[in-house]
Amino acid sequence: MTFVNMERIEKRFNNQTVLRDVSLKMNRGEIVSIIGPSGSGKSTFLRCLGQLETIDGGSITVDGTVLASTDANGTVNYASQETQHDLLLRMGMVFQSFNLFPHMTVLDNIMIAPRMVKGMKDDEISPIAEQLLNKVGLWEKRNMYPSRLSGGQQQRVAIA
């Protein structure tokens, strides 16, 4: 079953077209790489998926929920803020330049977002944080500070 379906995405900044008729289908659990030269629109395309950028045409469907679609008149219609919010809470994105809080441990860096964004309590977050850190192979580093980790380890913390 298709999990992410981005069809015929168009994106312009002023009169500059940066995405023209770009499509992507991903199945649940599938690992996909988007490659291309610098400035080719890879990050913009992903920002459109994460609703960090609006689209000027096309459609975006995630897990069966239509986030954006273009009608016959060329107008892009978006899902309600509530629908977008609920779906985006289940998504994550690691940016090319990611930042961890240097004064916080690995575990604290993992726990802060669910605490601040979702209002979760630490006893709810702790088992999830342990599972995520185990998944990226960093549970044993949970009490370390980012400066003590390699760049790759820091990126894995950001992914978790």
Where are these regions (language model features)?
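ABC family nucleotide-binding domain
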Residues: T2-A160
